[in-house]
Amino acid sequence: KTGEVVVAAAPLYTLLDFFMMCATIAGGEETLYQEKIAPDEVAREALERQRELLTLCDPIAFEINPIQVHEILSSNQKKFTYCPFVFGYSNYCRPGYSTYQLKACNVVRYGERMLKTTLGGTGLAISSKCEHLQETVDFCQYAASETIQKTIFFDAGGQPGYRTAWLDPAVNRRSNGFFADTLETMEQASMRPRYNGYMQLQDNGGTVLREYLMTGRDLTGTLERLNTLYRKSRGLQG
């Protein structure tokens, strides 16, 4: 309420935060992504809580993404000091990367539960048109190996995916504890939907949520429009 909190609420991230709130309130994903994204009572509570937070935040939240949140917090500005949940970038917790070194930790709790965040990240993929398949496979295995993940990969500014690297004392010493101090969040996070057609929902769902989150108008209609988009993305009727 002091105005020191900043969050990323550009359209895509409001949708992913909605997934997070639904998974947290529902206590898991078993009831999610059926005929609707979530049962009505879960979805309503999720959006109401998102709006409650955003009404306490600077309107700049609706224009920024997670990297911009990190840029703001690690800069010389004096207004914002904390973000309760955001995709993590370990670079900002390393010395010398930005004006100020950030400190990352596990996400906040909602009631008795830690928020069940939506897992992000990127990976390596091999094209079906690859002309040097074995060499490419060998490189992927090399890059993803335990030793490389906690040494060369991290040294080059990479964010390792190998769990052992997240627990490695040297890696954590050089990243202000980023990996060890956020590991619980990662371990209980939920995967975003992966069905064929999902990107249609991801690309447009946040825009559907945006007006309600900014104005508080027509919660019921907002959820109806979001679920219509969801059903269309899944090829469901109605």
Protein language model annotation of sequence segments:
Residues 1-36, 77-80:
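Extracytoplasmic/periplasmic solute-binding protein
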Residues 1, 54, 66-82, 207, ...:
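Short helices/loops that flank or line small-molecule/ion binding pockets
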Residues 47-55, 70, 127, 136-145, ...:
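Non-transmembrane alpha-helical segments in soluble domains
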Residues 79-86, 103:
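Paired acidic/hydrophobic, glycine-rich loop segments that form the ligand-binding mouth/hinge
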Residues 154-207, 211:
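Long, aromatic- and glycine/proline-rich binding clefts that accommodate carbohydrate-like moieties
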Residues 94-159:
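Extracytoplasmic/periplasmic substrate-recognition and gating elements
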Residues 19-22, 33-66, 107:
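Glycine-centered hinge/linker elements that transmit conformational signals in sensory
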